[in-house]
Amino acid sequence: MRNKKGISLIVLVITIIVIIILAAAVILTLNGNNPIENSKQATFDSDCAELKSAMSMYMTTFMAEDVNHDGPFANTGTVTIVETVPEDKAEAVPSETVGTTRTASDVVTWKTLGFSGRPASIDTATYNPATGLFDITATNTEVDNKVGW
């Protein structure tokens, strides 16, 4: 029988691969290029862009159906996007039925904007018609808020 001394080539290759993977993880962390945080930021940016597009379509539809343009998109006040409408605002929410008269409201539901629910990365969203800007806060505090976007 032969006595085997030393390490095999396979063990050496596996060790080198593990060291390379660990080095890559350390380099990414030190450079501030954290893929997990980048993905959270990208998700938030995507949700913000989708919200902006949905609000733009909603405003266009509302203005087309309301010839007096007397609604939540006047030059004063803000429009808050909410999960469900508070009882004191229930009568003011614009109707989803085409052809009916819409009334002014300072709240709009996510469903009205075409979302199945609030996007997971967005905590609150308020639209200011006077400036055309959103005030959006993220559920993840590490993500940059797009206030004034």
Whereabouts are the PLM-identified features?
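N-terminal signal-anchor/signal peptide hydrophobic helix marking the start
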Residues: 7-16
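N-terminal leader/signal peptides at the extreme start of proteins
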Residues: 1-7
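Membrane-proximal N-terminal amphipathic helix
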Residues: 36-66
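Periplasmic/extracellular, small/polar-rich flexible segments of pilin-like filament-forming proteins
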Residues: 56, 60-149
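C-terminal juxtamembrane segment of a hydrophobic transmembrane alpha-helix
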Residues: 19-40
